[in-house]
Design a protein with these regions (language model features):
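Structural core segment of the AMP-binding/adenylate-forming
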Residues: 4-79
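Conserved AMP-binding/adenylation subdomain of ANL enzymes
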Residues: 125-142, 149-250, 258-275
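AMP-binding/adenylate-forming catalytic core of the ANL superfamily
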Residues: 12, 19-22, 27-31, 368, ...
Length: 553
């Protein structure tokens, strides 16, 4: 038909809906229920759209909203039976070109004001052709999805799932409920945000912590043996970024083979005693988990892949419809987002947009069939992100190996510049801090300051368990203000920070956290966090500006 869809979640606010509506002036609005209709009719329309409601309406409802042209989903099905045989409709559909706009996805992401990303049919079709490079799927297999149905990554998955005759299971972002769904359905593939995999790992370690001392020691021993076995296996198989020939390669291979032989008996025994039981958490059919971006802690990726739960990290943006790079099933390169997709050109450039002459860290630029048409009615913003050479500035700081394997380090706009001129990427520090069971979320701050500070949202359940373990009073979970003011809690968090952010873990002196403050209010999706559970840094820096100011007094 050539129509353009503009998907949005049911959690859309009236403010956001008005911005989008007044920009695109849609002729038809499809809503899930009457609650959403009641919100949308508050918008001051220039031209009233046709409303389609998924749920059925009774006669009383139709009279109540008689000022609007409203149809139900059932009405549309009846219309469709007639229209699909209409020769005029068939002719219109035949004239749709692959380069025509297919969708506008409005995204605020981590920055704030929504922008409309225009994607063509060709953009979306490129994602379909690229998907098979990640996993080899079969008809009837079950694909569990956690992201909202309108999200660009989810849409890419959905097109492929239906095209290949698979079954799509939509689950929830709540880990416990998701695990119940896994138990009931036994999916083959699971696509989820990093936070969910982190939560599963934390729950595993939480259960282990309840075991007797000997059982805990056995678990940690076999995990270390599995780590060693996995590292050696990847060295032997060449599953690491190619940064050029080194005389140490042959030595590494020999050491890898030796290490693999030594670790194999312990890994095999660990599988029988421990890991096979853990793997059952994800059902009997599990093949691979897919997660996106660079926000997955390396320790979590290593843990899962070492014990036999393969996680394949991928990378993309809504502006790239979304896929840019992906790891491949059975060929995962730990700590990276995999290889740049075929047909895509990637470059690492400096802050001025010049391509780096030597391999190093810089801003990732990409050019290919997946790059968006532009931002809807925003030529200025489009020109800022897509250059005259067709390359799109992802805004991500990355490294690119000789064989096109990409490693995402952080966001260009997130870079903190201390007053001594040192540049700090907050993401690796935050990811490391969140490895602590006591820390739910961490936000590193310190722009133009002498040192770094951090806003820490504690894991209050784990804090109370810690207090109990050291013989201290347990607080009412609802009395968060009292918990964050407790000196024992403050010392415990400080000890965790020092244990994680230090030279031994690869952090430089100026990257260490010298001051922190504890937050009592949990982060919310749509406020402090995006739908992908990434922190919305600009919102947090503004909302907690007084707390940040007090860190540097």
């Amino acid at each position: 038909m050539g129509a353009v869809d503009i998907p949005k979640g049911s959690d859309v606010t009236l403010f956001e809906a008005e911005i989008i509506f007044n920009s695109v002036l849609p002729s038809v609005v499809i809503l899930e229920n009457l609650n959403l209709l009641n919100m949308f009719i508050q918008i001051k329309f220039t031209v009233k759209p046709i409303f389609i409601i998924i749920e059925n309406l009774n006669q009383e409802d139709r009279l109540k909203y008689s000022d609007f042209e409203i149809y139900t989903y059932s009405d549309c099905i009846l219309f469709g039976d007639t229209l699909r045989k209409d020769s005029e409709i068939i002719e219109i559909a035949s004239k749709v070109d692959s380069n025509d706009m297919a969708t506008i996805i409005y995204t605020s992401g981590t920055t704030g004001h929504p922008k409309g990303v225009m994607l063509s049919h060709a953009n979306l079709l490129y994602q379909v052709s690229s998907f098979s490079l990640m996993v080899d799927t079969h008809v009837g297999q079950i694909f569990m999805c956690i992201l909202p149905i309108w999200h660009s990554f989810q849409r890419s998955f959905s097109y492929n799932i239906f095209l290949k005759g698979m079954v799509c299971l939509f689950s929830t972002i709540v880990p416990r409920a998701m695990l119940d769904d896994i138990k009931n359905v036994n999916p083959h593939y699971i696509a989820a945000v990093p936070r969910l995999w982190i939560a599963i790992r934390q729950n595993i370690y939480k259960e282990v912590s309840k075991k007797p001392f000997i059982s805990r020691m056995i678990f940690h021993f076999f995990v270390k043996a599995a780590f060693l076995s996995d590292i050696c296996y990847r060295v032997v198989m060449g599953l690491y970024p190619d940064n050029g020939f080194s005389l140490f390669f042959p030595i590494k291979k020999i050491l890898g083979i030796f290490g693999l032989i030594c670790a194999f008996p312990f890994k095999a025994l660990g599988n029988v005693l421990i890991f096979n039981k853990i793997n059952k958490i994800l059902g009997n059919n599990f093949v691979v988990g897919i997660t996106g971006g660079g926000s997955m802690p390396l320790s979590a990726v290593r843990f899962f892949n070492s014990i036999g739960i393969e996680l394949a990290n991928a990378y993309g943006l809504t502006e790239t419809s979304p896929g840019v790079a992906s790891n491949k099933h059975k060929k995962v390169i730990i700590g990276t987002c995999g290889k740049i997709l075929p047909g895509t050109v990637a470059e690492i450039r400096d802050i001025d947009g010049n391509k780096l002459k030597k391999p190093g860290k810089g801003i990732l630029f990409v050019k290919g069939p997946q790059v968006m048409l532009g931002y809807y009615k925003d030529k200025e913003a489009t020109c800022k992100i897509i250059g005259s050479d067709g390359f799109l500035n992802t805004g991500d700081i990355a490294k690119l190996s000789k064989d096109n394997v990409v490693q995402i380090i952080g966001r260009e706009k997130d870079t903190i510049v201390l007053n001594n001129g040192e540049n700090v990427e907050p993401a690796p520090i935050e990811i490391k801090l969140e490895e602590s069971a006591l820390i739910e979320k961490a936000v590193v701050v310190g722009q133009d300051q002498k040192f770094l500070g951090a806003l820490i949202l504690p894991n209050f359940e784990e804090i109370n368990k810690y207090l109990e373990s050291v013989g201290q009073k347990i607080f009412d979970a609802n009395n968060r203000r009292q918990i964050i003011a407790n000196n024992i809690v403050l010392k415990a968090i400080n000890d965790e920070i020092k244990k994680l952010i230090n030279k031994a873990n690869g952090f430089k002196p100026f990257e260490q956290i010298l001051k922190f403050t504890l937050l009592e209010k949990p982060f919310e999706v749509g406020k402090e966090m995006s739908i992908k559970m990434d922190i919305k840094r600009s919102y947090i820096l503004n909302f907690y500006k007084n707390e940040i100011k007090n860190l540097f007094i």
